[in-house]
């Protein structure tokens, strides 16, 4: 007799080529056997000596490692089951009445004045129109702000250029002063006496002791 799994909905049958083992109900241990029966959850099911459950309904810790996971531990209980509830008849839903889709607003002619009137603003297209206005206003505000920032940058650039020119002039003046000081030192070192040049109305050079 080919062994098959007694679990509800399980179609596993013994096949030597498949790594599925089958385990008999522990009929000699009534308390443990009742736990197996409760786990199977089959109404009016009474296991016999031929009844068995396949290894797919046991967790790995239920097996003895030294036996290559082929033998169950003494108190192992199957706990992995897929319970399928009986199919209930689905209530047929009445088809919902489809509401006519709103037609887009169209321009109308006013019979009193004979002029083409703009389409009526419904809540939907009104919100779109308002959003569009907000977008345009935001864009204009951003453009003005960018223009203002560009003007400030240009002013700062001009100030920086002026400051750089002033700095270069001061550097040139400093270099000239350094040259004068250097020349004066060389002149003082070369002569043993110092002279003071008086204005031209003195018409002479007064010698001053060094």
From Swiss-Prot:
Molecular functions (GO terms): DNA-binding transcription factor activity; DNA-binding transcription repressor activity, RNA polymerase II-specific; identical protein binding; protein homodimerization activity; RNA polymerase II cis-regulatory region sequence-specific DNA binding; sequence-specific DNA binding; zinc ion binding
First-listed, main subcellular location of the protein, grouped into a coarse class: nucleus
Domain of life: Eukaryota
Zinc finger (THAP-type): 5-57
SMART domains reported in the protein's UniProt record: DM3 (SM00692), THAP (SM00980)
SUPFAM superfamilies per record: Glucocorticoid receptor-like (DNA-binding domain) (SSF57716)
GO CC terms, sorted: nucleus; PML body
Any one Gene Ontology BP term: regulation of transcription by RNA polymerase II
Location within or outside the cell: Nucleus, Nucleoplasm; Nucleus, PML body
Keywords from the UniProt entry: Cell cycle, Coiled coil, DNA-binding, Metal-binding, Nucleus, Transcription, Transcription regulation, Zinc, Zinc-finger
Keyword Cytoplasm attached: no
Intervals of motif HCFC1-binding motif (HBM): 131-134
Recorded coiled-coil stretches: 140-187
The protein's assembly and partners: Interacts with PAWR. Component of a THAP1/THAP3-HCFC1-OGT complex that contains, either THAP1 or THAP3, HCFC1 and OGT. Interacts with OGT. Interacts (via the HBM) with HCFC1 (via the Kelch-repeat domain); the interaction recruits HCFC1 to the RRM1 promoter.
Family membership noted in the UniProt record: Belongs to the THAP1 family.
Main function: DNA-binding transcription regulator that regulates endothelial cell proliferation and G1/S cell-cycle progression. Specifically binds the 5'-[AT]NTNN[GT]GGCA[AGT]-3' core DNA sequence and acts by modulating expression of pRB-E2F cell-cycle target genes, including RRM1. May also have pro-apoptotic activity by potentiating both serum-withdrawal and TNF-induced apoptosis.
Designated name of the protein: THAP domain-containing protein 1
Organism, scientific name: Rattus norvegicus
């Amino acid at each position: 007799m080919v062994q098959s799994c007694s679990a509800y909905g399980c179609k596993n049958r013994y096949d030597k080529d498949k790594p599925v083992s089958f385990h008999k109900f522990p009929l000699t241990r009534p308390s443990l056997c009742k736990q197996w029966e409760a786990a199977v959850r089959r109404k009016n099911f009474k296991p016999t000596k031929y009844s068995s459950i396949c290894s797919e309904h046991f967790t790995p810790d239920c097996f003895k490692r030294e036996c290559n996971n082929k033998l169950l531990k003494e108190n192992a209980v199957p706990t992995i089951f897929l319970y399928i509830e009986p199919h209930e008849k689905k209530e047929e839903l009445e088809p919902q009445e489809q509401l006519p889709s709103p037609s887009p607003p169209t321009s109308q002619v006013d019979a009193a004045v004979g002029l083409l009137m703009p389409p009526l603003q419904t809540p939907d297209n009104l919100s779109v129109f308002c959003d569009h206005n907000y977008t345009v206003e935001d864009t204009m505000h951003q453009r003005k702000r960018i223009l203002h920032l560009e003007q400030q940058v240009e002013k700062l650039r001009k100030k920086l250029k002026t400051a750089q020119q002033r700095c270069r002039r001061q550097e040139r003046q400093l270099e000239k002063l350094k040259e004068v000081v250097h020349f004066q030192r060389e002149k003082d070192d070369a002569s043993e006496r110092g002279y003071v040049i008086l204005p031209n109305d003195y018409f002479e050079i007064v010698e001053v002791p060094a």
